[in-house]
Amino acid sequence: MKSLGRHLVAEFYECDKEVLDNVQLIEQEMKQAAYESGATIVTSTFHRFLPYGVSGVVVISESHLTIHTWPEYGYAAIDLFTCGEDVDPWKAFEHLKKALKAKRVHVVEHERGRYDEIGIPEDSPHKVTV
């Protein structure tokens, strides 16, 4: 089934707690994940909370990558939403799994904007002129 995008909703467990609390490193690894997926980075913003935790977003031309960390639990919640056929969110997922040193993960892939649900003919090109 064709869709406008793919959205990975990922749970990362037993991650490196120091990595999860390092805002500069998290931003660097999220941008690298976007790059490895084939995405085009538009902008990013990240924030470190006190006493610990990081939240951030990398806005890409093809949608976004987000992260929220709980270093005290070794846990990160990650969303990787990409549109188009040239970007692979699974490459971003694999990069982040390694970078955060996650020992366990759970991930679900959702099709966003399924052609059959919004009335786009299956043989339509992904990009259309409006």
Curated annotation (Swiss-Prot):
Active site per UniProt: 63 (schiff-base intermediate with substrate), 68 (proton acceptor), 83 (proton donor)
Bound cofactor: record note: Binds 1 pyruvoyl group covalently per subunit.
Keyword Lyase listed: yes
Keywords: Autocatalytic cleavage, Decarboxylase, Lyase, Polyamine biosynthesis, Pyruvate, S-adenosyl-L-methionine, Schiff base, Spermidine biosynthesis, Zymogen
Cellular compartments per GO CC: cytosol
Positions where Pyruvic acid (Ser) occurs in the chain: 63
Enzyme class name: lyase
Annotated site (Cleavage (non-hydrolytic)): 62-63
Molecular function GO labels: adenosylmethionine decarboxylase activity
Biochemical pathway: Amine and polyamine biosynthesis; S-adenosylmethioninamine biosynthesis; S-adenosylmethioninamine from S-adenosyl-L-methionine: step 1/1
Keyword S-adenosyl-L-methionine belongs to the record: yes
Disulphide bonds in the chain: none
Free-text description of this protein's post-translational modifications in UniProt: Is synthesized initially as an inactive proenzyme. Formation of the active enzyme involves a self-maturation process in which the active site pyruvoyl group is generated from an internal serine residue via an autocatalytic post-translational modification. Two non-identical subunits are generated from the proenzyme in this reaction, and the pyruvate is formed at the N-terminus of the alpha chain, which is derived from the carboxyl end of the proenzyme.
Function in brief: Catalyzes the decarboxylation of S-adenosylmethionine to S-adenosylmethioninamine (dcAdoMet), the propylamine donor required for the synthesis of the polyamines spermine and spermidine from the diamine putrescine.
Family membership: Belongs to the prokaryotic AdoMetDC family. Type 1 subfamily.
Identification of the protein by name: S-adenosylmethionine decarboxylase proenzyme
Organism (species): Thermotoga petrophila (strain ATCC BAA-488 / DSM 13995 / JCM 10881 / RKU-1)
Source species taxonomy: Bacteria, Thermotogati, Thermotogota, Thermotogae, Thermotogales
Gene of this entry: speH
